[in-house]
Amino acid sequence: MKTTNYLKTVVVTCAISLTMMPAITQAQRNCANESHENFLKTKDSKREANRMSYNTMINDYIASNASKTSAVSFTLPIVVHVVYNTAGQNISNAQIISQIDVLNKDFGRTNTDAVNTPTAFAAVAANTNIQFCLAQRDPMGNPSTGIERRSTTVTSFSTDDKVKFYAQGGLDAWDPTKYLNLWVCNFGGGLLGYGEFPTGTVSNTFGAVIQYNAFGNTGNVAAPFNLGRTATHEFSHCFNLFHIWGDDGGACTGSDLCAD
């Protein structure tokens, strides 16, 4: 398996092909992506410049491959880090597997509600040629289920990435150049999740974090976010998709960087 270049290629491909995703247009969910991005900027003064440079790279890639008609298929190994404070938060393997199934259907456009794609987007909605599987080997090369669990004394997490570090009550990422890391935990404040935007350099916090009862479509899930679409939404941020309103703090001056 390729490492950094492998995931970089996937992120670029997905940023180009994920033109329309049902989870993005569902009833408004409490996504904390903007808050998390602002947190990251306080830690890295060059983050915004790096993101803009990365977006330029994507646009250059699109321009140089405008006539390309075939696509390369990718299957990405996911590791799910379950961080729980109560028994109910320690979701089952079946619930985790149901989430992988939803991701594969959404990214492959085999989801049953694909027929509801708005007419304006029907011509560009497509199979991304990206699929997901639970990792079969851990970073040491040992057999793995792609799931790890930890009981924590932390009752709820926020957008400050503490869930991504063992020393702060969470679980450390597996090598982010070889795995997509996905954390499942309990949020405070009614948050459902967030995903980290790419910058061209893969950090040890890269991945998505999802509220435990908005993960998957079976088991301990709570309506109306019991369809597994929150993870689809947050992973789309990891693949460089913005909210359509531009995440500008309500100023109405932002952009989702997609030509309408």
What would you call each of these model-derived segments?
Residues 10-19:
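Bacterial N-terminal signal peptides
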Residues 14, 24-73, 107:
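N-terminal zymogen propeptides
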Residues 97, 101-260:
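Metzincin-family zinc-dependent endopeptidase catalytic domain
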Residues 62-104, 184-187, 251:
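Fold-level signature of zinc-dependent metallopeptidase catalytic domains
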Residues 1-7:
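N-terminal secretory signal peptides that target proteins for export/translocation
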